[in-house]
Amino acid sequence: MRLRTSLGVASACASVASAALKVTEDNSTITLANDRLTSTFAKDKGRVSELFLDGQDLLGPISGNTGVGPYLDCYCIPSGFYTAGSTDPRLEVVQGTDSTGTKYAGVILNDTYTPTGQQFQQYWFLRDGETGLHTFSRLAYYNETTPFLRNLQEFRTLFRPNTELWTHLTSSEAQTAPLPSKEAIANEVVVQDATWRFNNTPNDAYYTQFSEYFTKYTFSNLWRDNSVHGLYADGTNSNGTTYGAWLVMNTKDTYYGGPLHSDLTVDGIVYNYLVSNHHGEGTPNITNGFDRTFGPQYYLFNGGKGSKSSLEDLRSEAETLADPGWNADFYDSIAKHVIGYAPSSKRGSVQGQVKLPKGSTRPIAILTVDGQYFQDNSVEASSHQYWAEMGQDGTFQLDHVKEGKYRLTVFADGIFGDFVHDGVEVQAGKVTKVQETWEQESAGVEVWRLGTPDKSSGEFLHGDAPDPTHPLHPPQHFIYWGAYDWQQDFPNGVNYTIGSSDPAVDFNTVHWSVYGPTPANPDVEYDTTHDWTINFSLDKKQLQQRKTATLTIQLAGAKTAAGNTDVYNATEPYANLALESYINEQKEPLTLLVGFNQSSSCIVRSAVSCYQVRSRMEFPADWLNVGNNVLTLHLPRNATDYETAVLPGTVYVQYDALRLELA
């Protein structure tokens, strides 16, 4: 039996039950409930207004946009932010039995933003026997009069509680902390956009255990590494019973940016960031005919019923669901309700092996839109993406891949460059075989390398190394950049010697043009920041009969005056940023130009891996000396931009790895 009820007009109270699953409607609300989870939707807002697990209120009282969710909002109308359901929310109920014999019920929000005609849909589904909500989100734009509207800058769903129930937030084992107390928040000091200092409440648990600084970016993560994040209640405010609220990324194919996309996860709100440019990656344009359905993802609520389970145990339970094969039969059954969702009948698999270069570690195989760099797949708004960790023999398997043509990209820690193969055809119901060999790039004999090519600047000072000053030891880069003191770390600037210096101590995770001011130091430093020195020695044998040298620089991120907007501003002299490399006494530099559309807000938003930029620069080998040599890495001195938010104006680059080759 399938029941479909339009709820745009108020109706009398009605209840339809199927086993434990029940749908109830009155003039103002719709309620979906099974034996354990009850979710109530407000008709006038088009969002979840109440959520109970085993009788425990998970949201708390509504206050503005808190005490609600999951709900959908965006930064996508001409003026900026919009919450779906704000104009003319129309809710619709669907019910049925899926192919496994399990009852389900769903609520679908339909809303149109009248000034532009943008259509929003948000889907929530509850199954019998589950304690979570399956979600899909859709945006459509059909407007021939204004064929280009703007970019889709943010598109997200939010679980936004307003209750003392939740005590901890977590996005990984290393990013787990107590939530700051009300007292800490009341006495916080703003130090940057969405960043606060808790120095006025030094006894707060967050301060003593995790950090003096709090920012939502501390809990951001790469999509490669992130499948589950959320909130935990340790029982302090729930009579000893523990609870978890999790966003489970069981599918990632409708996000953009591939496995290196990083985004916000949790900060007291549990986010599902479907689209954003927080760390500088591209976003799709909203043009006539744009029609995109994101999902599914799953908001899981667990614990309860006297649970004493730890945060780690409840998170592990959520992690078991973070698999695109989980509930695939159910999603096939509800595809008839979800506009734009591709069921299994439109999906195939890719099975392959790429012979890897010697020294490869953590290899990964990525499918993204054909003909485009994998971080740029948002240029094709309808594109899908997939990736899988590879075996050390280069084997990989990708299932549930939507039919179409893809680019295969492989990269691995320890190897410069990527393997790229276009034209991988995926057909529904079939297995596509791939057999390739990755011949790593080479410009001769490698003389030296600095850093590990791994798409990250985390191996350098204040990167991935754990913070020794707090017992939870978060990686240092997750903490606000201003917690560190450049003048103390590098009073004479960076002067690194190949073979004797320690990259974790003597090479910073970010090359600033300007540093400061910080909360602890009002000084602004630009004399020791913009030029870095790398010393290296070559013997006569290394240079014998060598004609060409090649310097490779890979950047894990770079911020130009364009910030993360991808917009060129002619009034900003550093919209395109030149990183210049000077060899010994040569007057002409080798130049890596970071374009305005390659810029990212990386370290200032607590990240060490953002939009990747690289260059291989040749020069005559006779520029090099037998004996001592000096490479100077130069950024423009005191180069800044105009910032509308409370953010540092300096430009900067973050090195992934460098190497010198001779041929």
UniProtKB/Swiss-Prot annotation:
SUPFAM superfamilies: Galactose mutarotase-like, Galactose-binding domain-like, Starch-binding domain-like
Gene Ontology terms: biological process: cell wall organization; polysaccharide catabolic process
Residues passing through the membrane, by range: none
Keyword Signal: yes
Superkingdom of source: Eukaryota
GO molecular function (one): carbohydrate binding
The EC number(s) this enzyme carries: 4.2.2.23
Compartments it resides in: Secreted
Extent of the signal sequence: 1-19
Glycosylation sites: 27, 110, 143, 239, 285, 495, 535, 569, 597, 638
Keywords carried by this UniProt record: Carbohydrate metabolism, Cell wall biogenesis/degradation, Glycoprotein, Lyase, Polysaccharide degradation, Secreted, Signal
The keyword Phosphoprotein appears for this protein: no
Any one cellular-component term (Gene Ontology): extracellular region
Family: Belongs to the polysaccharide lyase 4 family.
Protein name: Probable rhamnogalacturonate lyase B
